[in-house]
Amino acid sequence: MADKYKVVEIFKSISGESFHSGEVAVFVRLYGCNLRCKYGNNECDTPYSYEGNQYKLMTADEICDEVNKLSTNKFVVLTGGEPLIHPNIEFLLYEMAVLNHLKVDVETNGSVDIRSIVAKLMTIQNSSMLSENIIFTIDYKSPSCGMNSAMISDFAEMVDTINRCGFEVNVKCVITPTGEDIAAVKALVNRLDRISTLDTSQHLFISPVYGCDIAAIVDNMCKSELLSKCRLQLQIHKYIWDPEKRGV
């Protein structure tokens, strides 16, 4: 029997974050998350991805069929929730990237060891199409959201390993302008610079929490040699549409 995945929604919009911000994409949002982030009064912006059991069970074939109907550029964002906690997620990634030749940007929260996912992918087929067509955009959770302790303990080493395997890796630090958030990002940049092959100037992003003092974060970036290696990115979909609007 084919594996089935809990799908909350499939829709077409623009990628609002990270390296591929502004590109048209088909989003596949899977149900379930292992973290509960909260930034001050701001809860997770997609609580419906883990509350209420509002999802449809779909096979990889069914998901890819729906994506192919909507897509005009073969670019997919696999998001959640946390997509990598789904059992046998490697088979969905393989079907998308290899069998359907889709470019897949996997949005993951930094608490799941991607190295194990890559190892499972390689057991299906050690194909160059995997690294050519699968992107990992990894959130590094800052202290202010309460989930920093859930990050993989060797986060920088994990990023380096995946990058060395040939996959495009983007790291996104969602922060407020608090001192502890700024310090955490500085420590991460320093660690990545020392031990990894990741080009931080291209693939490390500072993403201000929607509604916070963005100017204060930019001021910190301008004053810090470490932070000035990062790129600022805004969740542009929240500025185009109502930030609570679904399906965009």
Where are the predicted features?
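Conserved AdoMet/S-adenosylmethionine-binding subsite of the radical SAM
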Residues: C64, L84-G247
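Short, Gly/Pro- and small/polar-rich lid/capping loops
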Residues: M1
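Conserved Radical SAM active-site core
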Residues: Y5-S15, V24-A25, L35, Y39-N133
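A short catalytic or substrate-binding loop motif that flags glycine-/basic-rich loops and adjacent residues
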Residues: F19-S21
